[in-house]
Amino acid sequence: MQEVMIERACALLADGTVSRVLGWKNGEFAYDPTPAVFDSAEALQKAFVYNDFCASNLSKYLIKLSRAEGKTLIFVKPCDSYSLNQLLTEHRVKRESIYVIGVPCDGKVSENKIRENGVEGVTSITTEGETVTVHTLYGDTAFQKTDIMDDRCIKIGRAHV
């Protein structure tokens, strides 16, 4: 999915449809992606990430970015669409200044639940179907995704159609 998102964002930047992309980049730790603004294809290809740790809601960052010149591309997970719609309803975000792409999400992984299972030193994760493999400094551990899914994700159960 990450590659498709980067490809689409690069195309929209290249043809001038958008001026910037609001997404995620790796934080200090593998389990802590942080919201980021990208203004070039090179920056996207170098630092953009979308994985099972990308739980941050990007909608609130549009309040300021929608006032900037040009359009901002935002990738919206199903649960984030609630807050984006509310910001639009309250006129806190200019609709004409954003380009929205809905992205699928079948739940994000909780770093706290991984730790509760005795796993430390996370370096990355890979997801294959319903199995999440947590790679650490000490080896790999496999989990069923539902066992380490963020509680918020379990409750929402909403998907883009």
Give a label for each model feature.
Residues 1-160:
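Iron-sulfur-associated redox domains of electron-transfer enzymes in respiratory
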